[in-house]
C-alpha cells in the first residue's frame, strides 16, 4: 500500500515535536523509518549516469563553499553549552569524541585514556614538537599532550570562548606553560607558515565543507620535514 506523501513543512513540524518529546514512541519510530527509506532511495538510484552527475554536483558544491558553514549554530547547539553539563555526562578527560574500549571491562575514563594514547601512537607524537590541534573541544587531547610531552608546544584552536576558558583554567591549575588556546572560526584562522610538526583534528570534519581549501592551509602550516 502506497503511503501518503508528507510535505516538508509538515515533516519539519513533526521533527520539532519529536525533539520536544511531544510525540509517542511509535510515531517517532515510524518517522525515522520513513526518512531512512527515502534517504536510501535517493542515495542508491541505480542509474550510473544519475549517480555520476549527482557526485560531480556534490564535489562542485563543496569546492564553492567556505571551509565550514553554520559555525555559530554548532556553537549554540554544542560548544557553548555550559561546561557543567558535560562534566556530568562525559568522562574524566571531558572527551567530546569517540573513546576506545579494548575489552568489555573498560570504564569510560579508561576508554578515554586508551583513545588519547592511540592518537599519540598513530600521529607519532613526541617531545620537542610544535603541535596544532584544530577543534580541541574541552581540551582532552591538548591537555593530555601537554602532560605527556612537556617539551612540546601545543596550539589548540576552538570556536568556543567557554572551551578556551575551561582549558586555560586547567592549564593554570596543572602548571602547564606549553599550551596556547586560540578562539577562532576555522574560516578565518591565520597562522604562521611552516610552523608545526603535527596538525591533529579529531572529529571536526563533520563541520567541514571545503576540504581542499583546509588541506591547502594545513599544508602551508606544516614544516617541510
Predicted features along the sequence, with ranges:
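Conserved SAM-binding strand-loop segment of SAM-dependent methyltransferases
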Residues: 173-188
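Conserved Class I S-adenosyl-L-methionine-dependent methyltransferase catalytic core
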Residues: 38-122, 126
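A short acidic, Gly/Pro-enriched loop at the edge of an enzyme's catalytic core
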Residues: 188-199
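Conserved SAM-binding motif I beta-strand of class I
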Residues: 153-158
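Conserved class I S-adenosyl-L-methionine
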Residues: 128-137
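Conserved SAM-binding loop
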Residues: 167-168
Amino acid at each position: 500500500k502506497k503511503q501518503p506523501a508528507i510535505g516538508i513543512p509538515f515533516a519539519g513540524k513533526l521533527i520539532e515535536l519529536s525533539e520536544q518529546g511531544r510525540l509517542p514512541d511509535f510515531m517517532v519510530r515510524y518517522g525515522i523509518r520513513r526518512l531512512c527509506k527515502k534517504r536510501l532511495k535517493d542515495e542508491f538510484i541505480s542509474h550510473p549516469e544519475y549517480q555520476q552527475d549527482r557526485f560531480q554536483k556534490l564535489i562542485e558544491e563543496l569546492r564553492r563553499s567556505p571551509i565550514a558553514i553554520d559555525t555559530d549554530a554548532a556553537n549554540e547547539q554544542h560548544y557553548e553549552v555550559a561546561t557543567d553539563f558535560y562534566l556530568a555526562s562525559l568522562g574524566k578527560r571531558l572527551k567530546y569524541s569517540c573513546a576506545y574500549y579494548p575489552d568489555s571491562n573498560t570504564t569510560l575514563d579508561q576508554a578515554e585514556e586508551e583513545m588519547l594514547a592511540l592518537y599519540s601512537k598513530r600521529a607519532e607524537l613526541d617531545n620537542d614538537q610544535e603541535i596544532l590541534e584544530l577543534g580541541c573541544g574541552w581540551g582532552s587531547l591538548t591537555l593530555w599532550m601537554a602532560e605527556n610531552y612537556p617539551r612540546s608546544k601545543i596550539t589548540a584552536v576552538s570556536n568556543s570562548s567557554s572551551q578556551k576558558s575551561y582549558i586555560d583554567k586547567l592549564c593554570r591549575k596543572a602548571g602547564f606553560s606549553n599550551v596556547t588556546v586560540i578562539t577562532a572560526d576555522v574560516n578565518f584562522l591565520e597562522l604562521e607558515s611552516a610552523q608545526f610538526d603535527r596538525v591533529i583534528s579529531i572529529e571536526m570534519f563533520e563541520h567541514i565543507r571545503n576540504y581542499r581549501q583546509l588541506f591547502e592551509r594545513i599544508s602551508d602550516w606544516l614544516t617541510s620535514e
